[in-house]
Amino acid sequence: MLGRLLRTNSFIDLLGSFPNGKDDGKGPQPHHEATPPPSSMHMPDELRTLLYGCRKVEGEGRGGEGRGSGTFRLVVAQELGQMMSRDNYQVVLDCGGTRAAVGSGGAEMPLSELKEYIFGSPVRLSDRCRSDKLKLSRGARVIVVTRIFYTGYAGNARRLAVCCCIPEQFLTVVTECWSQVSAWFDEVQDVLMPLLEAEPLLPKDLRVSAPAQVDVLLHKFYRHLILPLHGLLETHRLFLYPADSLDFVTAWFREVFNWLEVKDGHRLKFLPALLGKLRHDAAAELLHNRSSRIVVMSGNVTVANKLIFILSAFLRPRYSGQVHYVDDGLAARNVELKEAPADPKYSSTITSKGWEIPRKRSRSSVLSKSSDETSFAHVFLPSSLRSTNSLQYISSSLNSQYGSYGSWFKKTIPLGHSPRINESPDNTFMHHHTNSTSSLQQQQAGTCASGNNASSVTTSTTPNTNRWSQGSPSISEYEEYPWLGYGTAPSGAPSKSRIQKVNMPRNSNRVHDKKLLHERFVSICGDVQEVDFHTSPATESYGAILEVPILEELSFPSQELLPRYSSYLPTLDPAFQVQACPITSNTERRLVDCMKQDLHNAEYSRTLLISLRSREIKEITITKDPSTKTIVQRTKKIFLNGKPGHVSQKLHEEIHFVDNHLTATWKKWEDPVESEDKTKLFITSFHELMK
């Protein structure tokens, strides 16, 4: 009974409901609630390094002064046809908006100067072509994006303009998603054109004369431009390590073996089915079609992020530049600055007897909080649920959950287990091999706990320092198996794990690789002596002409700009192809709505939907029938009820290959008699799996 009670308290109940963001066409509503914090705020350092290639992303944690601050401005203007008059241009709508609210005024640039940017020279052109232009104003620190168009009537030669002023920090995002910005201009133009059917000019004040159209414009301005640009700029994207990086390969096998042991068990083949699908066609589909996605639904942030890291090994394109590491000398100096204070109550925790459990009851009650609860500090559990002994009594009730392979509490490390202080996860993973099936979990738990022992000394006044006892797990862990992850407290001693020292210079969406940019520039603008150009001689009709060859098929894969692959997000973002999101009642419905919107620019939209609560994998494909113009939705079950669904023979062979390959590699790694180099084993096995 208690197990079912805990299972109903999901992750969403703790955080509250998320806005569904559905485009209902009812106009913009004032949005004053606080922006949800990024999911990476309370992420452990090592997990951040695995996902992002560094512990701290540039521009993170600046609050209102961050990269995404600033006001957007929407201006609609028209030409009156009085070329000799100073009042030839009339502004019919001028409003501003931010991510928190829309409809407020924004006067960062004078209208007189802005009208010059919009319409330019008064000299008229002979054609009536539509034009888009972009200008960066250094003085006002804004990007002026303008659409100039004409009405559909032949006798009306007056120009109309839709202008958007965007903060300059969005420049890289605007150039990346220019097609989406152009589509937004088309939507605004479609709203304004019906107003010109009766009159040759727009009303002087659109807010008074056409309030319904203004509401639609502001709604599209907020939903289709402001929010997508903020999401692309501020959401942290995955860093795809090079496939030949030994540190990445070692960490990847460590997470895979941990998942197979803790999450799948001996019967469930969930991970092999997922990796087999990625190897078969799902990973390549992301490159061929921008409307394809991989979405992981989960109530546990840590578990979802670890699964994202595992499946990221099959994603492309991978980074091919140099991987940067933290200087050992700098890391040592930072540790010295974080030494524990010389206080007796901080220095008496660890004794020669190892890790002890207090036998005497204290009169003062201490509210314990595990690392997994840091993001839910406002949730208070009863003291009975925060006690390890009390949790052990209800383990039999939790055992009856669907897909449970033994009690979660039996998987934890005993309280008397004494970890070694100077071991790191990678060192233990590479050098300790036993025949026990639970050896990997014990090594992982012990070594990760030892990596955080110094911080435990400085942050705890109780003798209980073995964090793997997990005395107070978060409620979401009852639904999905708990993951013995890494502590959120910063490590107090220099770690020997090589992957933890990776420090890629980057911001949320780009890698700062000057060497890579220099190579790209040299390849385009090479040495003048090597360019095959010549000068044709002058004649009586014309002078000498310099002829330079043009490379028409010059193409460079994007390496600085990271692909739109992200980790756990507070809500579904259709702009990202790979992401994880919470499980809500309308997540799948909203996903289908986003896929239907993709059909405006693509022939089909496909999503691989992964549910960690029910351990289901299904592929949703939405197409439009060319003859009837109706939308056709097909759903294919890849994995359900603990086994693969009705899949093709080729996919079934891929799943079987991945399962056998991972099992064989795991057995070789655990076999103490195996004399093969473990490093070479991982590299060879990884490249065979990625073929």
UniProtKB/Swiss-Prot annotation:
GO terms for biological process: amino acid transport; cellular response to amino acid stimulus; positive regulation of TORC1 signaling; protein transport. Residues 607-687 form the dDENN FNIP1/2-type domain. GO terms for cellular component: FNIP-folliculin RagC/D GAP; vacuolar membrane. Residues 450-469 have a biased composition (Low complexity). Keywords: Amino-acid transport, Protein transport, Transport. Disulfide bonds: none annotated. Residues 17-44, 422-474 are annotated as: Disordered. GO terms for molecular function: GTPase activator activity. Coiled coil: none annotated. Residues 251-601 form the cDENN FNIP1/2-type domain. Residues 21-34 have a biased composition (Basic and acidic residues). Belongs to the LST4 family. This is Protein LST4.
